[in-house]
């Protein structure tokens, strides 16, 4: 599988998402900003300077949700706060379920230094009316979030535990039956952002592994896509058939001057 380079020159790229017009949205965690790449290759800056945006999700009312120190709904240049919590460093990845509820993870550890003392974060659910529920804790470094195609299973990458936390999801959005999968795939390096394909398999960015790994729903490694970067940070499906995989990084080993890069499988 070949990789096409779509954008470069960023810091730590995160949050790839596509819309029905095949625009690609992504963020730069440390340099700051949220960007949109149109199908013709034009790149627009939508949000300037906002740092620690680890997750983006399209909003039914237009615009998108973005994380950072708070969860914000951005639309046509205006931003409103959806969720703010005391005592956290940042909200990181987030993902909607089929009913539009948002599942978002928190980070309480130092994002830039990742000091030895790590404070576990949580996963919250944001309801359609804006109310929130803490679903579970003990997520040391919260990363990618995704759902099985039928919405019955929630996947949540925890970088410190080197695997993916899994829960069953009820019709009311509640979670149960916590378990942990995929650790053998990340013996070197850590899992970061992720997405789930239409067959229910997980595609997980592997920081320190120079790849995206494909896992079965029970955590067995099925395949991998080599990526020319030490820090492969996230991935997302897009394209007319939702079969193009967009992969983002914090570096580029083929051309170090390009730094954080956006790739697409071809």
Spans of model-derived segments:
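Sequence/structural signature of beta-propeller modules
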Residues: 1, 260-266
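Beta-strand initiation motifs
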Residues: 1-2, 41-44, 76-81, 126-133, ...
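Beta-rich, blade/repeat-based domains predominating
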Residues: 7-21, 49-68, 86-102, 108-110, ...
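Beta-propeller domains
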Residues: 25-45, 71-72
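Short, solvent-exposed loop/turn segments at conserved positions within beta-propeller repeat blades
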Residues: 29-30, 109-121, 159-162, 207-208, ...
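A short loop-to-beta-strand structural motif that recurs across blades of beta-propeller domains
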Residues: 33-35, 70-72, 121-124, 163-165, ...
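Short loop/turn segments immediately following beta-strands, especially the blade-tip
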Residues: 167-174, 266
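Glycine/small-residue-rich hydrophobic helix-like segments
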Residues: 172-236
């Amino acid at each position: 599988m070949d990789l096409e380079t779509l954008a470069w020159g960023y810091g730590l790229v995160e949050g790839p998402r596509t819309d029905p017009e095949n625009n690609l949205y992504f963020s730069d965690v440390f340099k700051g900003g949220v960007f949109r790449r149109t199908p013709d290759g034009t790149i627009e800056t939508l949000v300037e300077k906002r740092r620690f945006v680890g997750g983006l999700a399209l909003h039914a009312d237009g615009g998108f949700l973005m994380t950072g120190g708070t969860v914000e709904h951005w639309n046509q240049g205006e931003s409103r706060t959806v969720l703010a919590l005391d005592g956290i460093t940042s909200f990181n990845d987030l993902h909607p379920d089929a009913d539009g509820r948002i599942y978002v993870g928190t980070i309480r550890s130092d994002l830039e230094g990742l000091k030895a003392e790590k404070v576990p974060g949580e996963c919250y659910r944001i309801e359609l009316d804006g109310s929130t529920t803490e679903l579970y804790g003990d997520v040391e470094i919260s990363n990618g979030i995704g759902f099985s195609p039928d919405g019955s299973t929630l996947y949540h990458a925890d970088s410190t535990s080197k695997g993916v936390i899994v829960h069953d999801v009820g019709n009311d959005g509640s979670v149960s039956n916590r378990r942990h999968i995929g650790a053998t795939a990340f013996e070197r390096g850590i899992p970061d952002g992720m997405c789930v394909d239409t067959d229910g398999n997980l595609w997980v960015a592997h920081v320190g592994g120079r790849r995206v790994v494909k896992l079965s729903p029970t955590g067995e490694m099925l395949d991998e896509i080599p990526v020319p970067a030490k820090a492969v940070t996230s991935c997302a499906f897009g394209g007319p058939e939702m079969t193009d995989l967009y992969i983002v990084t914090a570096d580029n080993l083929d051309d170090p001057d390009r730094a954080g890069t956006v790739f697409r499988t071809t």
